[in-house]
Amino acid sequence: LDKYPDDAIQAGQAIKTVDDANQAIIGIYAAFKDASLYSGRLTLLPDLQTDLVYAVTGYSNQYGDLWRWNILATNEDIEAVYGALYAIINRCNFLLDYIPGVQQSTTDDDALDKLEMIHGEALFARALCYSELIKLFCNSYESDGEAENELGVVLTSHYDSVDNTRRASLKDSYQFVLDDLELAAEYLKIDENSVSKDDLYSTTYINEYTVYALRARIALYMKHYTEAIKYSTKVIDSGYY
């Protein structure tokens, strides 16, 4: 008999309702707390490469190669960061692929509003992961012309992608992030009349101004300083932070 495991869900049945989509986005939020990401290596390893850390006599040489800037291609800590970021991208792609189907089968306006917010959160999460990958594994962005000939990252926009896994250009990689952020900002647009200053300041969820903050950071990476000022000013002038 061809039986499916009792403790698993077939991919095609995983996201059928808005509640399913909400559970998926909660899982994406939780994935950022992975020991290889913001609860560990992604924040720890860069610190080890700065003057914030000094190796004393008798230390165990843990992370010693990173501290000495003698990093081999076989470094497992670097591999873990890379893999964890792409794992979240994969989860975002899975959710984003199924959102249109959920939207078609949903008639309640409040549920559709919730789904739109989830859509924006997933787009932001994917953009954030790609921005980290670009920052860590690509050369710096010097100009639009040079970026066309620099290697970027492997871009995937669908869970079951059959595209060749070749690296896009640095320019195209950044454009992918910008496109995701632009769409995310539309889905996460805040109704100024329905949210309080304190609620938005203390929220732990992605919102319109989270998108603008990352957009400003990306502009800095790209040396588009006017854009960086534009989007950072949106956050500052909002009065929420």
Predicted regions, residues:
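Residue signature of alpha-solenoid helical repeat architecture, marking inter-repeat boundaries
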Residues: M117, E150, D172, D199-S202, ...
